[in-house]
Regions:
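Central regulatory/effector-binding core of bacterial HTH transcription factors
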Residues: 68-126
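Alpha-helical linker/hinge and terminal dimerization helices associated
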Residues: 19-20, 41-63
Length: 272
């Protein structure tokens, strides 16, 4: 039943007796019986073992049920533009679950106090389990009235004479560099700008208002592009792709609520 050989049981008993400092069993060629000290020890530990088994069963039951509180940290752009509009589907599917969500694009200690984190960029934390959700293109865009005033770039180098809406790298505190990919070609351009932001939705709003040219993920830009509020520039140089990953800390089977959220986010990402 325990999966131990007789010699293994004997060694385990010997270690236990050495640990407690008393002889727990009387051994004879015919039988093994409890000593008086062994009977007292058995009477004291039996309720504790029963409580431990009950706690283990409770924990296993909780881990198998999608309920309780799930704490997640999600990239602001993905949270606002893709995930939030679909949350009613998630909460309807799991009525016993409370979703406690914070938004952040910082990667340092991103798992502090949360069960799942969702971030753009390649995985760089070996201790975490990373599930790739999607890849999205990086587009360069501007408002039509800005392009009417300043002209439309026809090559990446033309942006050196334009005003950029810059986005701050949360890891370095400096603006992200602007890269352009076309086939095997890679071009980096030093784009100047007097506005630096750390929230992509605010940066898009500034771009729509005519502040300048902005680089953004294609994911979530559809409404502005479809309405004509934003126009893509340099479409031939838009092959750079950026991944989105979901992270959780355990290499063992995660609780059901974590698996449910990961599967839902994967589902949402596939339809984005």
């Amino acid at each position: 039943m325990l999966g131990l050989t007789p010699s293994g049981v004997s060694r385990a008993v010997a270690r236990l007796e050495a640990r407690v400092g008393v002889r727990l069993f009387d051994r004879s060629p015919r039988a093994v019986t409890l000593t008086e000290e062994g009977r007292r020890f058995h009477a004291q530990v039996t309720p504790l073992l029963a409580g431990l088994e009950e706690a283990a069963l409770d924990a296993a039951g909780a881990a198998a049920t999608v309920d309780g509180r799930l704490r997640v940290s999600v990239d602001p752009w993905f949270a606002r533009m893709v995930l939030a509009p679909r949350l009613p589907d998630f909460t309807a599917r799991y009525p016993g679950l409370v979703l406690d969500m914070t938004v952040s694009n910082h990667r340092e200690e991103m798992m502090a106090g949360v069960d799942v984190a969702v971030r753009f960029g390649p995985p760089d934390v070996a201790s975490l389990i990373a599930r790739k959700l999607l890849e999205t293109r990086v587009l360069t865009c501007a408002a039509p009235d800005y392009l009417a005033r300043r002209g439309t770039p026809v090559a990446p180098q033309d942006l050196e004479g334009h005003e950029g809406v810059l986005f701050r790298n949360p890891q370095t505190g400096l603006p992200f560099g602007w890269e352009f990919h076309r086939g095997t070609e890679r071009v980096t351009v030093a784009v100047a700008g007097r506005v630096v932001m750390d929230d992509p939705s605010v940066a898009v709003a500034a771009c729509v208002a005519g502040q300048g040219v902005f680089q953004s993920f294609e994911l979530g830009l559809g409404p502005w592009m479809a309405s004509g509020q934003l126009v893509q520039v340099l479409p031939d140089w838009a092959e750079e792709r950026y991944p989105l990953y979901a992270y959780h800390p355990s290499r063992h089977l995660p609780p059901a609520k974590v698996r449910a959220f990961l599967d839902f986010v994967q589902e949402v990402a596939a339809g984005a």
